[in-house]
Regions:
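A structural detector for beta-sheet-dominated domains
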Residues: 20, 30, 40-44, 54, ...
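Short, aromatic- and cysteine-enriched interfacial helices/patches
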Residues: 66, 158-162, 186
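Low-complexity, repetitive regions of proteins mediating host interaction that are extracellular
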Residues: 23, 131, 141, 148-152, ...
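C-terminal assembly and membrane-engagement modules of membrane-active proteins
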Residues: 215-267
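N-terminal propeptides/leader regions of secreted preproproteins
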Residues: 2-124
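Short hydrophobic membrane-inserting alpha-helices and related fusion/pore-forming segments
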Residues: 147-172
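Transmembrane alpha-helical hairpins and terminal membrane-anchor modules
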Residues: 165-190
Length: 267
């Protein structure tokens, strides 16, 4: 068998994300129509395993095996993340802003219409709710890459666009070698995640009754052993993007239907 070094390759095609790819083993992930997370592992182009994590019970992983059976002699089984480590999950908010709502500022726009220009803007405020930390101690894990991905996803209930690059960084940072899709050297580590949830309120400066709530999240993930520790990941709308053209476009598209417009300034 050929040993392959872990890769940090992370790409997306349509709604399926490639989480891990070492040239022989490929792990992909996506969210199905019911909100479940689904992870698949391919070996030399052939599907060998599919794991499903229910949005209602993320600590249980349903596994299906293709072309062979697992070490338990079954084509299907379930595992619990607590079989592989110790989970300490806090649902208490560590911190909220001193004021119940933070004013980020106002984005001022100008659109071209038949009669000339129209000026308008968005007043943008947000709440920040910090939850955690959640910690998961992995005890001597040996097994497939897709199971490791699923275990971490289930432990932290973080979205696939976040768990993908983190697991790739963890595998690379720990210097793990994968042989035919299997991590054979026992992996032990403690991973910690602090989640910050943002709820934005966008209010039309020309009509206060025209408003909308949108969300985003920040995940600070670290561990005790990896060279890739202390990573921050963002999803959705976060203050990290405030002042960027991208955020001005995102928020405008959430609220307005003008096709020819520009940002005048931020205030």
């Amino acid at each position: 068998m050929t040993a392959h070094a872990a890769s940090t390759n992370y790409s997306s095609e349509e709604n399926v994300l490639t989480i891990y790819d070492d040239g022989e083993t490929v792990v992909k992930g996506y969210e199905d129509s019911t909100g479940n997370m689904v992870f698949t592992q391919y070996l030399r182009g052939n599907l060998v395993q599919r794991n499903t994590i229910s949005s209602n019970n993320p600590e249980i992983i349903r596994r299906e095996f293709f072309g062979n059976t697992n070490t338990r002699g079954a084509s299907k089984d379930t595992i619990n993340i607590n079989e592989y480590g110790v989970l300490n999950k806090s649902t208490a908010a560590l911190h909220q802003s001193v004021s119940p709502r933070t004013l980020a500022g106002t984005i001022n726009y100008r659109a071209i219409i038949d009669t000339g220009y129209v000026y308008y803007g968005l007043r943008c405020t947000y709440d920040a709710n910090v939850i955690g930390p959640t910690t998961y101690t992995i005890n001597g894990y040996v097994g497939t890459v897709v199971d490791l991905v699923s275990i971490i996803a289930g432990a932290f209930t973080i979205p696939i666009p976040i768990v993908g690059p983190y697991v790739a960084a963890l595998i690379s940072g720990l210097g793990i070698t994968v042989v035919s899709g299997v991590i054979e050297s026992a992996l032990s580590d403690t991973v910690s995640c602090i989640e910050t949830d943002y709820t934005w309120t966008l209010t039309d400066t020309t009509d206060s009754y025209h408003s909308k709530n949108v969300t985003g999240a920040k995940y600070y993930i670290t561990d005790t052993k990896s060279a890739a520790k202390d990573k921050t990941y963002y999803e959705g709308y976060t203050p990290n993007d405030w002042g960027t053209q991208a955020m001005a476009v995102w928020f405008h598209n959430e609220m307005f239907g003008y096709t020819a417009w520009e940002v005048v300034n931020w205030s």
